[in-house]
Every structure is written in C-alpha cells, then in structure tokens.
C-alpha cells in the first residue's frame, strides 16, 4: 500500500536538462524583426489587476483535490505579468497589492511567506497578509533563521560563531508560533522549520541535536485549536538527518517531515522513506532549487532565470514523481501543502501549472 502511495522506490536517474531557454533565440526570429523600431516604453499601472484566466485553467483547478494547496515561494516578481497579473508593476507595488491578486489565481491556494525567515514578523504583519487572502487560502510560514540556524552568519552567509538561540523553545514560541497563530488564525497552513546546513562538528553530534529538536517541538503550542489545518514541518539541508531516529522525534511531537527538493538533498525518491515512516501525515513540500545548479547554485539560478517569466530547465521527472506522491496522499484524505520557487525551473507559476497538469492526469488514470 505504501509503495503505491508514495510511488515506486526505484526510479531512473533524471536526465540533466538543457541549460538553454525554451524560448526562441533572436536567431530564430524573422529577419525583418532586426529592423523593427524598438517598442515604446511601457507605463506601469498604479493598480495591480488579476489576469483573466481561460476556461482550461479553471477546469484544471476544479479537477484537483480540495486537500491540495499549490503555490509559490513569495509573490513579488514583476516577471509574472501575463501569468498572474496584468501589466508592468514594481516590486514595491507587488509587495503591497500583489498577494490579493495572486490569491485570485485558480491554482494558487497557498503561498510561502519567505521573508519571515530573515526577520521575525509581527502579529499585525501576519494579520495584513491574512486580510488579503480568501477564507479557504492557507499560508506556509518559514520560521526565522535566528532559531533555525546553528550559526550566526555574516552578510555573505559565512558562519561566524555558534548561535545560542538555535532551537530555543522560548524564542520559537514568542518570535514565530504565537505571532503566526494570532495573525493568520485559521489561515495558517504549514509552519516550516528549515534547519540550515550544519558545520561538520555539529553533524558529528547529531544525537544531541535530535534531543534539542525534540525538546523544542514538544514545547510548542498546539496549532489545531486556532488553525485546524495547521501542521509543524521540519526541513533539513543535510542528508545525515534522514534517519529512523529523526522520524521518531517528529512522530512523537506530532510534526512531519518537509520534503525538500533541493540540490543539497537526495532526490525525491530517496526521501520517501521519511514520508512512509511518518504515515499517515499531511504532505509539506518545498521545491527550491534545480539540481543542475549544484548545492550552492542560488546565485547562478538567479542570474540565469531572472526575471522569472519563462521555464529554463523543466524537470519533468520530478514533476511526475511529485504528482504521484500528491495524488496518493490526497486520495487518502490528507492535506498537501506544496510551494515552488522560481529557482526550481525558472518560473514558479508555470511549474505550478505543470505539476497541476500531472496531478490531474494521475487522478484521471486511477481506477475508481
């Protein structure tokens, strides 16, 4: 049953996609285009308005299970014009008005609030986000790095010294869980603790860190009274965490594993034993970075993919495997929170559409 639920444990190694864009190059354009007058500068609108979506997109959304909440990592990307909103808009405009428009997209039923990772947010900030989303929308919140990073880091990301606040139960409650619960209320979906890569000295003491994590998780207030769909999830960036002992800690605390699709981690199939060990449990997945860029390839992905208006490296095997996991879990009544970064394939809204197509196809092919 569980092999069917989470997909086959064996999967072929995905081919490395081409590094070339899926759009035609200038050399492919008609010769006359070289002599065309440059387009007039486009004026930015003062109001962000939603794209009019076609019937096919609306039908696709209706074919997806209600337990599935697909979305992106943040929403303030001007390059999403024509996909999520109309016209040209600045980052500042989208920061203020973009969420309400984003939440009107038929496929976008969640979003990851990534800025909370860099600095704790206040109750009023969370309340502002909640007020811009419909009642059925759910937020994925990243716990601040002040409690999820074992190191205090410099501006360039290098670790300088041990972080005394790492996994502090008191700070986690006051700086993360309580503000998110109070501000988002029932719209809180997944609260994700992304544990940053550990120095080698700490990896050698992983049993001690597991006990520290256990203490922190057990000290957290229950989410369900305020947020019935709320779930605590732990994401890691070191494969050494993926052990039965880690699964036991999560199970005891009523938390789940965040499936992290990132070049620092093993591929999706290799992480499925963690999901099996915690079953039944909601799915929380963050698709972060295409492996073609390597484990430290964020800057390379940003340079290549910006302004995030098209797909550059479609990862069709990962889409297919993820869709199978989503379909298996939601068919059995569990929620699924899946957020996708622009760094996954180049344009998060298009990847969301691709995953949605795959999920709909899996469900349509399943015996009834």
Where are these regions (language model features)?
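Residues lining hydrophobic/aromatic ligand-binding pockets adjacent to catalytic sites
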Residues: 1-368
């Amino acid at each position: 049953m569980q092999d069917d639920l989470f997909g086959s444990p064996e999967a072929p190694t995905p081919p490395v996609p081409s590094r070339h864009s899926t759009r035609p190059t200038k050399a492919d354009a008609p010769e006359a285009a070289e002599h065309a007058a440059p387009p007039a500068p486009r004026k930015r609108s003062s109001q962000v308005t939603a794209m009019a979506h076609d019937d096919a997109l609306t039908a696709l959304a209706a074919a997806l299970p209600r337990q599935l909440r697909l979305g992106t990592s943040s929403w303030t990307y001007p390059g999403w014009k024509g996909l999520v909103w109309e016209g040209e808009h600045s980052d500042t405009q989208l920061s203020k008005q973009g969420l309400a428009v984003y939440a009107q997209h038929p496929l976008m039923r969640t979003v990851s609030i990534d800025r909370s990772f860099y600095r704790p947010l206040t109750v009023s900030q969370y309340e502002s986000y909640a007020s811009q989303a419909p009642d059925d929308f759910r937020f994925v919140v990243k716990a601040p790095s002040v409690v999820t990073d074992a190191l205090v880091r410099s501006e360039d990301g290098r670790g300088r010294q041990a972080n005394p606040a790492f996994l502090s139960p008191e700070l986690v409650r006051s700086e993360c869980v309580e503000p998110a619960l109070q501000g988002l209320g029932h719209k809180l979906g997944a609260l994700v603790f992304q544990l940053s890569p550990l120095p080698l000295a700490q990896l050698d003491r992983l049993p001690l860190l597991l006990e520290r994590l256990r203490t922190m998780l057990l000290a957290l207030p229950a989410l369900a009274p305020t947020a019935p769909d709320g779930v605590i999830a732990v994401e890691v960036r070191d494969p050494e965490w993926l052990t039965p002992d880690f699964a036991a800690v999560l199970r005891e605390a009523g938390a789940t594993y965040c499936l992290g699709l990132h070049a620092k981690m093993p591929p999706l199939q290799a992480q499925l034993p963690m999901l099996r060990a915690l079953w039944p449990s909601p799915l929380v997945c963050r698709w972060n970075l295409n492996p073609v860029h390597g484990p430290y390839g964020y800057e390379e992905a940003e340079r290549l993919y910006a302004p995030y208006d098209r797909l550059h490296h479609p990862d069709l095997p990962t889409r297919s495997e993820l869709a199978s996991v989503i379909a298996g879990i939601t068919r059995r009544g569990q929620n699924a929170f899946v957020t996708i970064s622009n760094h996954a394939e180049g344009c998060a809204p298009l990847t969301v559409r691709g995953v949605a197509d795959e999920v709909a196809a899996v469900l349509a092919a399943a015996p009834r």
